[in-house]
Amino acid sequence: MMPLIDLWTALPLAKLEVGHHFYWYIGNLRVHGQVFITTWFVMALLIAVAFVASRNIQRVPSGIQNLMEYALEFIRDLTKSQMGEHEYRAWVPFVGTLFLFIFVCNWSGALVPWKLIELPEGELAAPTNDINTTVALALLVSLAYFYAGLRKRGLKYFTKYIEPTPVLLPIAILEDFTKPLSLSFRLFGNILADELVVSVLVLLVPLFVPLPVMVLGLFTSAIQALVFATLAATYIGEAMEGHGGDHEAAHS
């Protein structure tokens, strides 16, 4: 046991730091370089898996094609349950991209040994461990449901702000700000907390003790991806439904 612990402590682990970043400068713009590195890794992984799964499509799926078809069916059912039979098809790619990207980002924080890679400043971690990533994803959802509502209902979309009574106008406007805030901070907070707990346990009690926490973190990460995708589909569905008559007409 002692040789294993000595080997672990001898590894060049990055320091456990919060709020320190590896900055890249693009002109006068300063960006978090470590987020771009891990995001590109996740994107490359997803593109590679999609390419392999679709390279030789069989009528009877097997292997990775079977896995991807199961994921597609799951995302399609999720989107359909939140948007209804008539509207869901056009939004399956968007919701599916959100779910798969967040899912792989979250799991990369638990499964990829980012701490073994030292940077001049900061440390590598899951892309969703950075508030900039989660805010960007939440703003994409906000733009999507505004677009969906305006495309489906035209200017009637804005009647939702004064229904059932104009007194609720301030609350309806405030809701448009709280939706992206809740989406972004929920995802960011859960992933950051999970990675901090695992990092502290690895530093204090390496090897076997952190394993149950890591397994729990994988489960939590998957749930967070599901929650984000479900809420995104729900918000888009609500924007297209409107109130009362629109909802009934859409499902008649």
From Swiss-Prot:
Q: Which Pfam families match?
A: ATP-synt_A (PF00119)
UniProt feature coiled coil, ranges:
none
User: Which superkingdom, per the lineage?
Assistant: Bacteria
Any single GO CC term annotated in Swiss-Prot or TrEMBL for this entry: proton-transporting ATP synthase complex
Report if keyword Ligase is assigned.
Answer: no
Predominant localisation class: membrane
Membrane topology recorded in Swiss-Prot or TrEMBL: Multi-pass membrane protein
- GO-annotated molecular function: proton-transporting ATP synthase activity, rotational mechanism
**Localization terms from the record:** Cellular thylakoid membrane
Q: Where are the transmembrane segments?
A: 33-53, 92-112, 130-150, 196-216, 217-237
Keyword tags: ATP synthesis, CF(0), Hydrogen ion transport, Ion transport, Membrane, Thylakoid, Transmembrane, Transmembrane helix, Transport
UniProt-listed CDD domains: ATP-synt_Fo_a_6
Task: Provide the function of this protein.
Answer: Key component of the proton channel; it plays a direct role in the translocation of protons across the membrane.
Task: Give the protein family.
Answer: Belongs to the ATPase A chain family.
Subunit composition? F-type ATPases have 2 components, CF(1) - the catalytic core - and CF(0) - the membrane proton channel. CF(1) has five subunits: alpha(3), beta(3), gamma(1), delta(1), epsilon(1). CF(0) has four main subunits: a, b, b' and c.
Q: What is this protein called?
A: ATP synthase subunit a
Gene source species: Thermosynechococcus vestitus (strain NIES-2133 / IAM M-273 / BP-1)
